[in-house]
């Protein structure tokens, strides 16, 4: 009997942390994909496509003989999160100037955080999209520069992490806090349950 319940097709330490805190047992199985948005692609369409492509890539990798040898057939969980401001997808900043521009744009405004979750095995695939609305306070240039200097924004969509220092900029959130982090727990647990992976 294996000591894990599913494969996590994600490089995100935040998603792994959320799942570990819930008590799930999983093995990492992820690979890089092209995350470039298509021309005029909507935020919800983009995150759903990314979640599915991550899942497909991980399952394809698993099927390779060297990886799948002595590995059990279990579901694969993948997800993708994007920050959307006025229909524009804000991915991870390319550099500090990009992070500064994103944070200036988010200042004193409400944006969407959309996360798509995908669970699949050899027989079926199920997906869900969760959308939250997040409002930032007015950010000063000193706050923006100080935050960028911590390095925290550089690996996060929209250039902030709500569960860390970036949370001090959030005035209001409507939706899922864990979804803004990168994995909406209510929806994710329901998807996993449909594949026989249960918490209780």
UniProtKB/Swiss-Prot annotation:
Catalytic activity: dTTP + H2O = dTMP + diphosphate + H(+); UTP + H2O = UMP + diphosphate + H(+)
Top EC class, one word: hydrolase
GO terms for biological process, alphabetical: nucleotide metabolic process
Entry keyword set: Cytoplasm, Hydrolase, Nucleotide metabolism
Source superkingdom: Bacteria
Compartment(s) of residence: Cytoplasm
EC number, as in UniProt: 3.6.1.9
Active site: 80 (proton acceptor)
Record flagged with keyword ATP-binding: no
Stored InterPro entries: ITPase-like_fam, Maf-like
Family recorded in the similarity comment: Belongs to the Maf family. YhdE subfamily.
Name of the featured protein: dTTP/UTP pyrophosphatase
């Amino acid at each position: 009997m294996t000591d894990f319940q599913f494969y996590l097709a994600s490089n995100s330490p935040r998603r792994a942390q959320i799942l570990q805190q819930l008590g799930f047992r999983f093995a990492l199985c992820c690979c890089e994909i092209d995350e470039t948005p298509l021309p005029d692609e909507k935020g919800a369409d983009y995150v759903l496509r990314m979640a599915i492509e991550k899942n497909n890539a991980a399952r394809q990798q698993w099927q390779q003989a060297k990886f799948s040898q002595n590995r059990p057939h279990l579901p694969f969980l993948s997800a993708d999160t994007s920050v959307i401001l006025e229909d524009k997808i804000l991915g991870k900043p390319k550099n500090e100037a990009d992070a500064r521009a994103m944070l200036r744009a988010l200042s004193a405004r409400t944006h969407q955080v959309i996360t798509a979750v995908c669970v699949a095995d050899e027989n079926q695939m199920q997906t869900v999209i969760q959308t939250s609305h997040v409002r930032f306070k007015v950010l000063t240039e000193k706050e923006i520069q100080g935050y960028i200097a911590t390095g925290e924004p550089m690996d996060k969509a929209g250039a902030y992490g709500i569960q860390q220092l970036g949370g001090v900029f959030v005035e209001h959130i409507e939706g899922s806090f864990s979804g803004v982090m990168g994995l909406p727990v209510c929806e994710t647990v329901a998807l996993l349950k449909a594949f026989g992976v249960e918490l209780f």
